[in-house]
Regions:
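A cytosolic small-molecule/anion-sensing beta-strand core signal
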Residues: 15-16, 34-35, 56, 81
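Short phosphate-coordinating micro-motif centered on Lys-Gly-acidic
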Residues: 19-26
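Glycine- and acidic-residue-biased ligand/ion/polar-headgroup-sensing regions
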Residues: 28-41, 57-58
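Cyclic-nucleotide recognition modules
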Residues: 51-109
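Polybasic "coupling" helices that flank or enter modular domains
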Residues: 80, 98-163
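Phosphate-/nucleic-acid-contacting segments
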Residues: 141-206
Length: 206
């Protein structure tokens, strides 16, 4: 890691494979991927299921955990390639939002979009269509610009996480594979196109 400049916003460089932060660390800064790619890993079901996503520049990192009741990172982040990170202190973020209405509006729009995910997801989880559960999980736990989304799993743990019997889960995965929405090798699900999964399985009126 290399600290390039000491100013209200800091630029840091990470080499491929370096840890940027770990799940559970305090969100002391608003961070952005400004060059390269970073890989986020979210541990689920006691760590037996791992959701992996690639964050590609330019993108913001978990700003909805900067303030509020939970101010720790929900995932671990490592540099997937040589990666540039810009970080701003919380105090500086507040000062920007107080002085710049466009920045304030952008932040409110981002937070509102993420808050509305919960409403959509809860309604879908209550529906009788169990095929939506995988889409809901991906929808909730990944960013709308995330790429190379993968889920590493053991069958019993993924069944538990989705609340499905083994036969129902295998049928779901087989159906999604047939439609080209996921690729599966028995221990890892690959989701080539997040938008396709969300558009097909999480939409009003389905």
């Amino acid at each position: 890691m290399e600290l390039i400049e000491k100013v209200p916003f800091h630029f840091l460089k990470f080499e491929e494979g370096q840890t940027i932060f770990k799940a559970g660390e305090q969100t002391e800064f608003m961070r952005f991927v400004v060059s390269g790619q970073a890989q986020a890993e979210t541990a689920l079901c006691g760590g037996n299921v791992t959701l992996i996503q690639t964050i590609t520049a330019p993108d913001v990192i978990a700003p909805d955990f900067l303030f509020g009741r939970i101010t720790t990172y929900p995932f671990s982040l490592t540099a997937k390639t040589e990666c540039g990170i810009m970080q701003l202190s919380k105090a500086y973020v507040v000062s920007i939002m107080q002085s710049d209405k466009i920045c304030l509006l952008n932040m409110l729009n981002y937070l509102s979009r993420n808050a509305q995910k919960g409403d959509v997801s809860y309604k879908r989880m209550l529906s009788s269509d169990t095929s939506q559960r995988l889409a809901v999980m991906v929808f909730m736990l990944t960013g709308h610009r995330s790429q190379d989304i993968r889920i590493r799993y053991k069958q019993k743990d993924l069944c538990k996480l989705l609340g499905l019997r083994r036969s129902a889960m295998l049928e779901l995965i087989s159906e999604l594979e047939t439609r080209g929405v996921v690729l599966d090798n028995g221990t890892e699900l690959q989701i080539p196109d997040r938008q396709q999964l969300v558009a097909e399985l999480v939409k009003p009126g389905k």
